């Protein structure tokens, strides 16, 4: 492991690879306990999470629903609730995957909020967007979509006295691959410190089908490139990112991209600048 790999892995609190099935189950139990502790410390009984159709939100939701199920069983209090939220922009091209995720999760409640009217209304009122290039406008509005989704989740959480769950993990965090104050905003991040293959392994341990576990990851925020794979945006694969974070050798081109992107996106992983 090179020094910079160790530095980044420590900063992101990257967890070691699962040695075996028992280690995986122990990590699942630890993260479920973490979610339960967050609710106890906040003195709240509701969790809210947006479901995209990807493996990250699927895995976070499976952990959340298990935590809620355990709390109800332990306390006898039926008020403990997990709310899964669908947040499409009009009609989502992979809606069938989102519905398949919901079938696996079996959430206590499922809500749907179409973010398109809010996103379009805001974009129409921002004069700075009117003269931008199509590519720039598409990128900026893509971030508006992510932030609007989080506004919707916090609106539900506020109405139901709940906490909002985020889906950030180490393989996304190192690349700064989230919208600042969008999907990067949450009350708790139960996947933090995991690399992508560990997120997939946890989903698989819950019995999620391979079609969802191995689905090509996409943020799907840009209308001009719908369904654009994350890896096309990164310039490296998740396998390379995972290997880097676990101190394994990666080719020099991938190494340089990961380090440069980590440094360029440092502001996204920090609190606002203050004097």
Swiss-Prot record:
Example GO molecular function: glutaminase activity
Known partners and oligomeric status: Homodimer.
Species of origin: Pseudomonas putida (strain ATCC 700007 / DSM 6899 / JCM 31910 / BCRC 17059 / LMG 24140 / F1)
Reaction(s) the record says it catalyses: deamido-NAD(+) + NH4(+) + ATP = AMP + diphosphate + NAD(+) + H(+)
Pathway: Cofactor biosynthesis; NAD(+) biosynthesis; NAD(+) from deamido-NAD(+) (ammonia route): step 1/1
Gene: nadE
NCBIfam families: nadE (TIGR00552), PRK00768.1 (NF001979)
List of residues binding deamido-NAD(+): 147, 180, 187, 267-268
Swiss-Prot/TrEMBL GO biological process terms: NAD biosynthetic process
Positions annotated to bind ATP: 50-57, 167, 196, 218
SUPFAM superfamilies, per database record: Adenine nucleotide alpha hydrolases-like
CDD domains in the cross-refs: NAD_synthase
Protein name from the UniProt record: NH(3)-dependent NAD(+) synthetase
Function per UniProt: Catalyzes the ATP-dependent amidation of deamido-NAD to form NAD. Uses ammonia as a nitrogen source.
Regions crossing the membrane: none
Alphabetical keyword list: ATP-binding, Ligase, Magnesium, Metal-binding, NAD, Nucleotide-binding
Domain of life: Bacteria
Family listed: Belongs to the NAD synthetase family.
